[in-house]
Amino acid sequence: MDPSLLLDQMLQDVSNLPAEFRYMLEEVGLEDEQCLELRKRYQQKEGILHKYIKQNGSLAANPKEDELLAEVEQSMAQVRELQEEKCQRANTILFLVSRHLNKLQQNIIMLEEDGLLAPAEDEMESGPDFSRESSVVGSTVSERKRKAASEDHPRRKKQSRSMSNTHREKSYNKGDDTADVKSPASTEREGTLDLQNYQEELFSSMNDNEKEDQNLYCFCQRVSFGEMVACDGPNCKYEWFHYECVNLTEPPKGTWYCPDCKQEMSKKLKKKKQ
């Protein structure tokens, strides 16, 4: 395998990412502004209610209380919806970064196995020439060394609490001119796709030629599909789980551990107490 060809392909794969990320971050910024405006709105309504109580006492009925409370609840629901959309966009960015780092890692392994690239450990021992490794690549290689259970189960860094695995394979048609490729972000700008369809198109467009996400995950040992959640256990055997396999219907709040990791942590806790 020619290293220059791998480099050219990698650069081609990531060439559209800056525009995609810029668009998604701009959308997050706009949603932040909407959230702030909605917060001001419902805080103003709450202020009216508190002012009435101060002036008339808590026992006096406010004729506008039901109307004001309904407006407060509506604004809070809109804020919650916007926050969820922001999380989806952030998860999309993190997922794409992780995906390309994983591909870069696999290319490094391939070159090392072909003898075209010295292993990372040998380079560090032979001298201070780290030109091949940026801090990101170095951390990726370390992750590979730590978690290389098998080639069928490459570990993805825990970049999000959960992610939508609608990244079905569709060709980027690499022979075409880059200018002719219409990005999912530009499609959404035209208003033809909602957020969910945008994510589906974004993930779909990545990997028909790469065929790199046929790995098996979860207790069920099936490929990724639907919603998936990452276990926060540092030594989790599977790391990613389908919602249905762990009885989840929505993203968990805070830290989440799979049943196996919970059991292992419980055993360690009992040993410490003894």
Curated annotation (Swiss-Prot):
One of its GO terms (cellular component) is piccolo histone acetyltransferase complex. Keywords: Cell cycle, Chromatin regulator, DNA damage, DNA repair, Meiosis, Metal-binding, Nucleus, Zinc, Zinc-finger. Zn(2+) 2 binds at C231, C236, C258, C261. Residues 121-194 are annotated as: Disordered. It is found in: Nucleus. A zinc finger (PHD-type) spans 215-264. The record marks Y217, M228, D232, W240 as: Histone H3K4me3 binding. GO terms for molecular function: histone acetyltransferase activity; histone H3K4me3 reader activity; methylated histone binding; zinc ion binding. PROSITE patterns: ZF_PHD_1, ZF_PHD_2. Pfam families: ING, PHD. InterPro entries: ING_fam, ING_N_histone-binding, Zinc_finger_PHD-type_CS, Znf_FYVE_PHD, Znf_PHD, Znf_PHD-finger, Znf_RING/FYVE/PHD. Zn(2+) 1 binds at C218, C220, H242, C245. GO terms for biological process: DNA repair; meiotic cell cycle; regulation of DNA-templated transcription. Component of the NuA4 histone acetyltransferase complex which is involved in transcriptional activation of selected genes principally by acetylation of nucleosomal histone H4 and H2A. The NuA4 complex is also involved in DNA repair. Involved in cell cycle progression and meiosis. Interacts with H3K4me3 and to a lesser extent with H3K4me2. Component of the NuA4 histone acetyltransferase complex. Belongs to the ING family. This is Chromatin modification-related protein YNG2. It comes from Candida glabrata (strain ATCC 2001 / BCRC 20586 / JCM 3761 / NBRC 0622 / NRRL Y-65 / CBS 138) (Yeast).
